[in-house]
Amino acid sequence: MSRDTDFVFTFARPIGVSDVLDALGAAGWVPDDMGSITYHIDLEDGDAQQRPMDEFPAAVAELEQGVAAGHISTIMLTWRDTGTGGSFFFYPSGDRLMLAPILNTRTRADHPDFLDLEWYMSRLLGPLAGIGLTGVETTDLA
């Protein structure tokens, strides 16, 4: 069964790409998409960029430039060594961040058709609250 799941985080003020990635990185999120960094500077152009892991600062700079130019930019992040994660969307307004959990998704043991929202929330709320998080909206639809 295909599901549409996402998390939308809102902030009190515009938050930069570096602010988000620094906070998430300190908590255990890494830009490791099977050994490389995968990101979109402009989601609308459809072409993903890939870089070696040691070129993370250059990827962040490109993401920041994309958002500053008015584009929705994304980067794949995973939780430490689990490979669980997804695509994090950065919006030009800077007051919103979205996660589409598409990599090795965690489902509930008692209801495996549903995403384990708590698994994700327990790894995201702390670091994002530290940079001004004011709200979260989740969706899990068949």
Regions found by a protein language model. Name each.
Residues 53-142:
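Charged interaction segments
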Residues 1-44, 140-142:
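Short, extreme N-terminal segment that most often corresponds to the first beta-strand
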Residues 20-24, 46, 103, 112-115:
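Surface-exposed beta-strand edges and their flanking turn/coil or helix-capping segments
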Residues 10-14, 44-46, 80-82, 104-106:
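Generic structural motif
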